[in-house]
């Protein structure tokens, strides 16, 4: 199956689902988790950047023994709304009891350095413990594909990306995820415009791609 055939197959599956699932959503919500604590920008201290964040939200999390690793999204100014991803740790028992240190120490792990992150940065980590370290799915928002044809910051591509860290949280590599042959110039690589992905057992990955002409 070629890349274009794969994309058309995914579109057709999505269209079939939409034809069956359309309707009005009922006015009902059900909390699946107990709220323990809120962590806002006033509650954190970023150790490796001089400015205080204006927003701290959408954290990824990894439970390792009795320690919770948090990977929050950090926004330091609203003009460009560029994001970085930080790292903090909390004892599980303290988190369950609603106790956090004030301020909570946070270190920036990921920030925009590549063209595919050059507009709005690194967003919304989904973190996983992997052999030899940690893996973070995130959304890189920058210049990729047709977005490279203009300098306008209003034109960008949001792309599923993956960063790998060693045991000491030193970055080993990061890149956008694509299916197919390496090298965009071949026309045989399908980049995945999606904000949701997670590892399943082994090396299997669960994706929710965004497809042209279909609602997210």
Tell me the role of every PLM-derived stretch.
Residues 1-54, 62-120, 128-216:
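Beta-rich carbohydrate-recognition and catalytic domains
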